[in-house]
From Swiss-Prot:
GO MF assignments: structural molecule activity
Keyword terms: Glycoprotein, Late protein, Virion
Extent of Polar residues compositional bias: 10-31
Chief location of this protein within or outside the cell: virion
Origin species: Orgyia pseudotsugata multicapsid polyhedrosis virus (OpMNPV)
Protein name in UniProt: Structural glycoprotein gp41
Domain of life from the UniProt record: Viruses
Record keyword Glycoprotein present: yes
Length: 367
């Protein structure tokens, strides 16, 4: 009983004694219950609104993360761009793909237009003859010659739509003119440079491969098998220059070299290297500490380290034996690798054939 007000307090049946949503007060004289409203209901409504807003924000964050991940997967399958994918994400993608392949196939209606490769070749030849007009390709004398009007009418609009149209759905005349202007300047400059240097214009594959290699290295992404083979073969000049530069920096900084490559480092790493050399030079004479690798090896040997007979730096740092090697996360079998390479080659050949057909023919006008 409340001695001050003369009422009996009956808590609500909500089960929470400290936060009742309502209270029933009973008069000690009349015995009739009296309902008194409290402000707790409004507080609960405000808290529920805040929780709902927090839940919406959390759902939006997860939605954005999932959408971003899906975009990365789509870009990976369309452009083979793995620069923003971690090894765990690639393994997750491969797991989903394997699950879809191993699961029961979905029934679909497919119209088979060709029974064999010969039928496909005959279809392409017939299509080429159908699109050809006035024997334009034969008059040029070479099927690989792009200096003809059909290239401007077929291939150039696709290039202008991709890079100079500003994202519009329809191709504008200004975008086509700008693309033609830029391509003309680029070809003229490359021809002039080639004649000046007595070096023919190379195919862009080497430079594009080097750009992809640098991008993957900066992103610490998994290197594809073809990229690893290109690095091992040392058949590409730009990739060799990148690897030689990295090795030259390490040799110059830690193996008795000079200070030539200091400007390559940022201020933080430059200070670290200078401080490391000063500290090592303080611990030992300059003649003994010039090569930091040998100095550390001598200290370890003096402390009792005995290297194994078959242990060497090449074995320990080889990609196949490294724990954090990108190859450790690749679980493709030989059959899967062969199928992937065949699929890439098939798509490349298909695009190449259609590109030749496009710039070797002029579209016909139908009345």
């Amino acid at each position: 009983m409340n001695e001050r007000d003369g009422f009996y307090l009956t808590p609500s049946q909500s089960g929470h004694p400290f936060a009742p949503t309502s209270a029933t007060l009973t008069s000690s004289q009349s015995g009739y219950p009296t309902a008194v409203s409290t402000t707790l209901s409004r507080a609960d409504s405000r808290s529920n609104t805040a929780l709902a807003k927090a839940g919406d924000v959390g759902e939006a964050i997860w939605y954005n993360k999932c959408t971003d991940y899906v975009h990365k997967i789509i870009r990976y399958y369309r452009c083979n761009d793995m620069s923003e994918l971690t090894p765990l994400m690639i393994q997750f993608i491969n797991t989903i793909r394997d699950m879809c392949i191993d699961s029961n196939p979905v029934s679909a209606n497919i119209i088979k237009r060709a029974q064999s490769d010969d039928d496909i070749v005959r279809h392409l030849i017939g299509l080429q003859k159908e699109l050809r007009q006035n024997s334009v390709a034969e008059a040029i004398g070479s099927d690989f010659n792009i200096f003809q009007p059909s290239f401007v009418l077929n291939s150039l609009p696709a290039y202008a739509q991709k890079f100079y149209n500003g994202g519009a759905n329809t191709l504008g005349k200004d975008a086509l003119n700008e693309a033609a202007k830029q391509l003309s300047l680029a070809v003229q400059y490359m021809v002039s440079e080639a004649v000046t240097c007595s070096i023919p214009i190379p195919l862009p594959f080497d430079q594009q491969l080097a750009n992809n290699y640098v991008t993957l290295l900066l992103k610490r992404a998994t290197l594809p098998d073809n990229m690893q083979e290109a690095v091992k073969s040392r058949s590409f000049v730009h990739i060799n220059m990148i690897n030689d530069l990295i090795n030259a920096v390490i040799e110059d900084l830690f193996a008795g070299g000079g200070t030539y490559y200091y400007y390559v480092l940022n201020e933080k790493n430059r200070a670290r290297v200078v401080g490391l050399k000063e500290n090592v030079g303080f611990l030992a004479p300059i003649s003994a500490s010039a090569d930091i690798f040998n100095y550390i090896a001598q200290l370890a040997t003096q402390q009792g380290k005995r290297p194994d007979m078959f242990e060497n730096a090449a074995f320990l740092t080889a990609a196949a034996h490294a724990i954090n090697s990108p190859a450790a996360h690749l679980t493709q079998s030989a059959c899967q690798k062969s199928l992937s390479q065949l699929a890439a080659q098939c798509e490349t050949l298909t695009r190449f054939v259609f590109m030749i057909m496009n710039h070797n023919t002029v579209p016909t006008t139908r009345g």
